[in-house]
Amino acid sequence: MILLVTLISLMSFIYIDNHIKELYKEVNIEESAIEFYIDIADEIGNKEVQLSWKELMAIDMVRFRKDLTSIRKKDVIDVGKKFIKNEVDKQGNKIKKVKRFDKVIDEIGFNSEEKKLANEYLEELKGVSLSGDTLKNQDEKIKFIEKVSELSYENYEKYNILPSITVGQAILESSWGESNLSKNSNNIFGIKSDTRWNGKVVKANTSENYDDKIVATFRKYDSIKESINDYGKFLNENKRYKESGLFKATHYTTQAQALEDAGYATKKNEDGELIYADILINLIKNYSLQLLDREIQEIE
């Protein structure tokens, strides 16, 4: 039986956005259970829409009285499908949206006490993540996620880049905003300068593969916001990203793969295999960044 222990707040800084704070509270949930629900949430969404694995788990904690040891995959999938609604956008295209948690538990037939429990469990699960690095007392990382995620929604509206991808790449490319390139130029995506760039530049060391080091010229920005805006513009103006299917992809796994396919990074392991998409996907899963996408796909 999986037991929830006392929820421990990971930060007390009142200036940090509540949503970001709630992403990183510590609850003792077995890693295997988290992976199980993450994978099922992605499977149900079928790379078209993002479900919340935490909402699925909270519902099952009510249905099975917190004993998740005998859960059947089919049972979870049946509930998960209730979150998905087929709609038509303004252009007449068929799309999938996600129903609100309260609507689904009502459809399931939970009584008032069960609804209360489901919401309590969901609140406790808000801070659970797959990562062993729970960000406890690491306020600089929390603030970095907050800063980038706030701007990522605007980037999504303009260029259809999922918030999870924007935040995940920013973390990966800038080492949580701590890289020399990031500190010296506000370039948090590692975008190099080319003939199309007329702005400021800076030279910095970089590593393309697992064991090499080179010096390259990168774009320099006056702010993080400018870096994020140019990141979206850079992807949009380079036809190879359109050809790779980046802008049509609606799931973090397919957008990550499209970035790799288009050559955003050519990083390889010692066996010569491209590994950028896998690294980015794992980072997003580890910190539950895919739940940022859940918000933009919810039915209003």
Q: Which residues does each PLM region occupy?
A:
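Catalytic cores of secreted/periplasmic lytic hydrolases that degrade extracellular macromolecules
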Residues: 1-167, 171-172, 176-300
